[in-house]
Structure formats: C-alpha cells, structure tokens
Amino acid sequence: MSAHYTTEPPPTASATLHTTFGPIHIALFANQTPLTCKNFLQHCLDNYYAGTIFHRIVPDFIVQGGDPTGTGSGGTSIYEYPEFEYDPEARDPNEKVVLRDELHSRLRFNRRGLVGMAKSEDGTYGSQFFITLANAERELNGQCTLFGRVEGDSIYNVLKIAEAERVERTERPVYPVKVVSCEVGELGPFAGKLKRRETIATAPAAEEKPAAKKKKKAKGGKTLLSFGGDEGDEDVPLRPSKPKFNPTLVVDAGIPPANDAPKKTSPEAEQQTRKRPRSPSPRRSLSAERKHRPKTPDPLTQLPLPDPESPARSPPQSPPARQSILSRTRAEIENLKASMRRTVATGPADTGRKKSALEAMIPETAIRGRKRPPPGTVNGAGRGSSTNGVTGFSSAAEDETLRMFNAFKAKLESADAKSGPHGKTSISASDTTKYTSQAKSNTEPEDEEAQLCDLHFIANCQSCKSWDDTGTAEEAPDDDDRDWLTHELRFGKDMLGKDLQWKREHPDDVDSLVVIDPREREKEFVGGKRRGLERDRERDRKRERVGDQEWDRRRREKP
C-alpha cells in the first residue's frame, strides 16, 4: 500500500466522522481539490452530517452516505447559499460557483479507503460522499472527484459498515449506520476563512420541505361599540358565524334546521328505532372514509424510502404456496400409508343371511384366521377333514412316508448284518492306490502306444480325455445291487496337488514348482566366481613359470 501513497500528494486538511460503529478519520487533499474540500469542511463545521445514515452499500465497491433525507436524492452544497455563491478560488471569480468535477492526475481510485463525491444526475455535486472498498479505477477514474482518504485503523470501521445486512435485492442496509457528530481537525489553506454557521446550516432543510398551508381562521363579527342608547342595537342580535357546539348533538332553537321541511316520523317508527338501533349504512361509511382520507402529497416534496420493517399492505403470496405444498405432501404420505394397509377383506362374502348376535359383535375390519383342530385329533371339524392340525399335511400321506422310511432303514440294517460276517466290502484308499498302480504298471507297456494322446503325446492325457468317456465303466464288472448299501466313501491322496512332502520325496519332478532363493543363488555365484578365479590364478602361475623360462631363452637367443 505504500506504493500507492508515494503517488498521492500529501493531505493538507482533516476531519472526523463519529458513527455508531466508531470514528472515521479522513485526510483531505485541499490543495488539489479546493472547492470540494471547502464544501466538505464547511458541512462538518455546521454539523450538517449529524443524524445522516450510510444509505447505500455495494459490496466490494463503495459505501455511500451524506444525504440528510436518507433516500439518496437529497443534499445540497454550500455554494447554493448566497454567502458562498462567489469564490476567489474558482476558475472565474465573477461567476457563481457550481460544484463540478475536480480531477487530478495523481488522485486515482486504485485502492480501498478513498473518499469521493457522489454525482447527481445533472453532473453536479451536493453533500453526498462515498468511500471505496476495493480498486475502482475502471468505474470511477475520470467520473467522480477524489478529495480524501481514510487514515489509520478507522478503515476497519468502514469495513464493518460494509458488512451490514441489506434488504433483499436492494443496496439499502436493513439497520443503517448513523453519523453521530462531525469534528474538524485541520483546515489547512482554509484556516481563518471557514467558521461554524448556526442559522444557515438549517436553512436548506427548511427550503426542502415547504410549509403546509394553514387554514385561515374565521373572523368574528365586526360590530361597533355600543353605549346602550344607539338605534338598531335591539334589532340586530350579535351571533357568531359558526356555532360553538355540535349541532347533531345539541339543538338550538335560535338556529334554523338544515332542512327546510323535516320529515315527520310516526310513533311506530320511533318505537322500532328505539328498540333496534339501525346499523350505519355503507354509503355513510364510504363518505366518512372519503372525508377522513388524507390529501394527496405535493409531488415536489421528497418522500423517504419505504421502511423495510413496516408490514406490507397486501399479504404475501408465498405462505399459501407453502401450505399447499405441505398439504400435498401430507396427502401423499397418507395415501402411501393407506396402500400399505390391508384393505381387502379376507372373510367370506356376504351371502345375505342374517348374522347372529355373536357375529354382529365382530367388527368388519377384523381378519378371520385359519381354523386349526386341536393336536392329537385326526380331523378337526369332522370326518371329512383331510389335513392334520399340527403339520397341515394329510395324515394318510404322513403315515405312508413313515412306513417307507422304516422299510429303508430296515433294509440298510439287514445289508450291514449280511456283510458283517463275510467281511467288509469296502476297500481302503491305500489298497486301491496300490492295486491301481500295479494294474497300471502291468498294462502300461502293452497299452502305451494305444493310450498316447495325439496332441500332447502323453499316455492317459486327461486334457484330451472326454469327461463322458464310459469305456472304463463298461469294461468294469457289474457290482451287486446291494453293494452300494454297505459301501464306505473314502478319498485317496490327491497326487495332482503335489503337497510339500510329495515334492520333497520327488525332487526331480518336472512339473513341480521350483523356488529360487536369490540369496542362495548369490552365494553360489560368488562361490563359483571365486573358484573360477582361483583356477585362473593357478593356471596363470603355471604359465608364468613356463613362460619365464621360454621367454628368457628367446630373449637370449635374439641378437
């Protein structure tokens, strides 16, 4: 921020606005913008801004205030008073001053905390000012007069004002911040030229609101002094132009009635009116409303903005919509609950016969349950019932099932008894493996060529063998029908899985998984390398012994 300070000229005057959120210290560039600073300082001296509000808040842009009406369309400059119409610091001292733009090349809206004048529609300035909240060069440079900046920690009070809650879809705060008082610190070049004005400070407010027209009071009857002896005193009675009482309540004999021919009411009608008072007619109420209706305001007077907290004349349309949505949702929930209930009657249809007293006591929504006979009885209601009361199945079918189960059980027991003395018919897994291995070894050389696979050239290849091949089953002898009754199921050792023990017993198996430990391989490689180096060294030693002798011999032979 110091880079921006170096481009700005030094301020020469200062003022302070005391708000409900704290003070705002403003330094003024009086040498660069003399007319604008003079206008602002004079308003501060006159306490013109006391009671005004910050009526406009635009987030990340500006905070605007200085309007005594609080609407954004009020406020006047000091140059509208005769005392300040001519200023020697203006461009033409002989012409009336109209406060317009005072632009300077070193004053730019390039940061927050800069104070400028709010321009009206006709391009002139009044008393309204604004404080920037961010960089606004594109929007404000060359458009509005920059005449000051916020000093010190008071910029945080400006940020608090900018965080105020706003009315929906407007730039007006709900609870606006008010300026309590004004204080002038340094006048700078205006020292000795500006002073506080007591009577003129309130003049613009009186000019803005024109005085209401007062009704002229009725003048009393003009009479001459009477000394009791003049002629005509007795003939002309003195009466006021307007009675001092309500003629509808009090009747004066001296005043003629409003209607020349009053209507005569019959005694019967008078009795009816006494017994039952008549309610006021709508015409009379309408006339009363028209009589008490306020006059239309003057279009030239400034009206304040509508208070956002005041109740609206017409009720909003949103609550009925919410109620309709809520009622629709509740109706959908009730329909869903009703669909989940059992609404179909399970009882017998009405045959038209007369119900007994006991049946009449049963509610219509009751569900009739299934009749169950007591346990132990074959039929519940009578001989014709076909279901059992306990299981719900037919008793005859149940007896037949039990009979068949007992017969099968007896058959198994008899088969075990018959096979017991002769020995067990089951064969252990080890015997079967031995038998199959011997049979294979006996038949392998004979059937090796016949059983070779055409694709893999492997004997008894399981990949090429069809799963539904029943050749072995046809060749096997037929077993007795009763052998399966006494057969015991036993599983042999899985040779295809090749567990760890089998691998240890068959280390040379090609299909077995080979595990290579890199550390062992490293040891073997290092050991072999060392052994190879030792062999090379030994070979070199032998060659050196022989070579030395031959070399020496050849060297000697050379001239």
Swiss-Prot record:
CC annotations in GO: catalytic step 2 spliceosome; cytoplasm
GO terms (molecular function) for this protein are: peptidyl-prolyl cis-trans isomerase activity
InterPro entries reported in the protein's UniProt record = Cyclophilin-like_dom_sf, Cyclophilin-type_PPIase_CS, Cyclophilin-type_PPIase_dom, Cyclophilin_A-like
Q: Where is the composition biased (Polar residues)?
A: 384-394, 425-442
Q: What is its EC number?
A: 5.2.1.8
- What span is annotated as the signal peptide, if there is one? none
Q: Where is the composition biased (Pro residues)?
A: 305-319
Q: Which UniProt keywords apply?
A: Cytoplasm, Isomerase, mRNA processing, mRNA splicing, Nucleus, Rotamase, Spliceosome
The UniProt annotation puts the region (Disordered) at 201-395, 413-449, 518-559
- The chain positions of domain PPIase cyclophilin-type read 11-184
Q: Where in the cell is it found?
A: Cytoplasm; Nucleus
Reactions catalysed: [protein]-peptidylproline (omega=180) = [protein]-peptidylproline (omega=0)
Q: Where does the record place Basic and acidic residues bias?
A: 261-273
SUPFAM superfamilies attached here?
Answer: Cyclophilin-like (SSF50891)
Q: Tell me any Pfam family this protein matches.
A: Pro_isomerase
Q: Give the protein family.
A: Belongs to the cyclophilin-type PPIase family. CWC27 subfamily.
Q: Which PANTHER family match?
A: PEPTIDYL-PROLYL CIS-TRANS ISOMERASE-RELATED, SPLICEOSOME-ASSOCIATED PROTEIN CWC27 HOMOLOG
Quaternary structure and interacting proteins, as annotated = Associated with the spliceosome.
The identity of this protein, by name, is Peptidyl-prolyl isomerase cwc27
- Name its species: Aspergillus fumigatus (strain ATCC MYA-4609 / CBS 101355 / FGSC A1100 / Af293)
